[in-house]
Amino acid sequence: MDKVKGTNLGNWLVLEKWMSPGIFEGTGAEDEIWLGRKLSADKLAAKLKEHRDSYVNEEDFAFIAQYGLNLVRIPVPYFIFDDRPPYPGCAEYLDKAFDWAEKYGLQILIDLHTCPGSQNGYDNGGITGVCKWCKNPTEVEYELTVLERLAQRYGNRKGLYGIEVLNEPISWLVYITAPSTGKAEDKEEAKGSGHVPMPFLKQFYKDAYARLRAILPKEKVIVFHDGFRLGAWKDFFVREGMENVALDTHIYVFAMENFVPIHKPWVYQIYINSQKKAVEKAARYTPVIVGEWCICNRYAEKPPQKVMLLEEADRIRRERYQENAAMQLAAWNTSAGHIYWNYQLLRSRTEEPDERWKESWDLSRCLINDWLDYNK
């Protein structure tokens, strides 16, 4: 396969409230696990079925292929195989995704995005403020069996690029600075939460590789997230004799903005160049994919200082997004590939998100608005 040029189908099989909050309306839940706790099993199943049936369909795969992308990364929950009630499984939707991907010449990276007890305490890990999975050997083993079942079911599909073992297992530094830390709905449940230690993560990755490689054809890639520690891996995968693997790192300009008070293109360029060098250094040993990135930035959303026509303001916004996109694509094109987060937020492209800045997280809108051009 050529260099990975893809997009994520997040918020389809793994919910994230900020992306399309409508499904959570009236429940008081902040994440998918609590949605299941706030609703009856029947109501949860009905809500998820309605969402999964409508949020992504065949026309989206056609759209993605039309714009020259070659891969979709699909986050899936640990309960994909319908064995953790009350949460309905969703393997039948991933089955459809493979049919559509193969029809339009796309590859799929299956991304195991959550685990029982969470690996990061984010809403995208299933339950906000709780991060205890790595301390429960039974659930660690369960997660490995989910990976095995994914490999058995999809390993021989033509459209399978590979399987990502686990999304964003959190480091100590990221854990202590994450806004979600300390925001658990049930404080008792969150007791004992903490980061995922590097020795544990290395052993889990070795175990996951052994189980997956025993099932997957050798041409299928096994992908490992860097755990927010890109520079720590060095030659680990080489020393362990792992073949046809890749390292996934997630790079967001907007995250840098939380720590740097100046939001200007020259600051973004410095940051992007530093991340590019880090990716290139890690890639001396193992191919690196920038598995999540987007063009969201405060400079593009900053209102012009002088009053002007709406058309002129939109032009300035577009040019600022184009500049940021060009910077990032130039950098990430030196890696093994890049995967935009996310393909969409709201299902309807005519419906405005609740906050204007969210538009830049929606790749379909970025492409239609000419904010990003993969061919330049």
What are the language-model segments listed below?
Residues 10-12, 77, 113-117, 165-168, ...:
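Active-site beta-loop-alpha junctions enriched in small/polar residues
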Residues 159, 168-326:
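Extracellular glycoside hydrolase catalytic/binding regions
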Residues 45-72, 82, 86-114, 124-162, ...:
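An active-site-proximal structural segment forming one wall of the substrate-binding cleft
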Residues 1-69:
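N-terminal carbohydrate-binding accessory modules
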Residues 3-9, 72-74, 108-112, 161-163, ...:
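Hydrophobic faces of well-ordered beta-strands that scaffold small-molecule active sites
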Residues 44-52, 78-91, 129-141, 169-171, ...:
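The substrate-binding groove and active-site-proximal loops of carbohydrate-active enzymes
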Residues 307, 311-376:
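Aromatic-rich peripheral "rim/lid" segments of glycoside hydrolase catalytic domains that contact
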Residues 17-30, 88-89, 117-135, 178-185, ...:
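Aromatic- and acidic-residue-enriched segments that line the glycan-binding/catalytic groove
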